[in-house]
Amino acid sequence: MQTILGSGGAIGSELAKALYQNHTKEIRLVSRNPKRVNPTDELYSADLSNPTEIDAAIAGSEVVYITIGFEYKLKVWREKWPAFIRSVIESCTNHKAKLVFFDNVYMYAKEEIPHMTEESKMSPPSEKGKVRKQLVDLILEAVKAKKISALIARSADFYGPGIGTSMLQETVFKNLQKDKAAQWLGGVNFKHSFTFTPDAAQATAMLGNTPNAYNQVWHLPTHSDTLTGKEWTELFAHQMNKKAKVSPIPKFMLKILGWFIPILGEFYEMTYQYEQPYFFDSSKFMKRFPEFKITGYQEGVQQIVAQAYQNTDVKE
């Protein structure tokens, strides 16, 4: 049994598809209100802030994937994330399950953002980044103590069909849909890597089912030909037959907008990632899995646009 904790988000449902297609039909989907992705999925409703329910959800699992996303709020992250990770580690230890943690880049030092690798220094300038570093430390300490086998599958900012949590899609795609100018945090001429969610899910499933991939950090496959904010806007506009207009969002505006749209206020401390080049190096993964085909940015944008016009409902 392979279990996904947080199965309803941008990555969880894609991961369920990838596991079913290529690795196993024994998949358990865990969230408050799990929905079947594949015909044979086992649905398990649980409150993932409750250690007892976490333990019951993990029981009988060979591999446990963490793809849950708690509310994007520092106070919630501080309260929920460390306790959740401790509970998962304890349950994986008790049930002899391997752990795969789907991670982001918030824990990296500011100066590492222009070229991030698995060896980049973890010295986060943001409070949310400090929470993320704490989670990584907890997992790596458990590995070092030989309590569990675990791996960290790390993604850049992501984009993909039908998701409502991508900064790229929220600020560029959705504005162009409304015939408005796209918006971009920071300078529009800085290059910025984005990981395509179906690629991230396929790669995470591969890692979880590769025994010698454990007890280390992996950057998930991300196209090396990065684009600037202006180029991302032009790419979306071309696919949508829209005019390519983009305006930068000044940092101070996030503070003001945060009074009305709280998530923008929460993102204020992360703007350093958009004020310089942002390059996510996944060459380690590609050397280990050279057969993996990374989706090109043009194809990724085509899929997003096609999906949006086929189905106007966007998953949150």
Language model region names:
Residues 2, 203-267, 282, 287, ...:
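Mid/C-terminal beta-alpha module of Rossmann-like enzyme folds, strongest
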Residues 2-22:
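N-terminal Rossmann NAD(P)H-binding glycine-rich loop of SDR-like oxidoreductase domains
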Residues 29-36, 102:
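Short, polar loop motifs at secondary-structure junctions
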Residues 35-36, 41-95:
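NAD(P)H-binding glycine-rich loop region in Rossmannoid oxidoreductase-like domains
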Residues 78-82, 114, 125-137, 166-170, ...:
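Short-chain dehydrogenase/reductase
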Residues 86-132, 151:
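Conserved Rossmann-fold NAD(P)-dependent oxidoreductase catalytic core, especially the SDR/UDP-sugar
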Residues 104, 137-162:
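Conserved beta-loop-beta element that borders a ligand/cofactor-binding pocket
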Residues 164-171, 185-208, 215-219:
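Substrate-positioning beta->alpha
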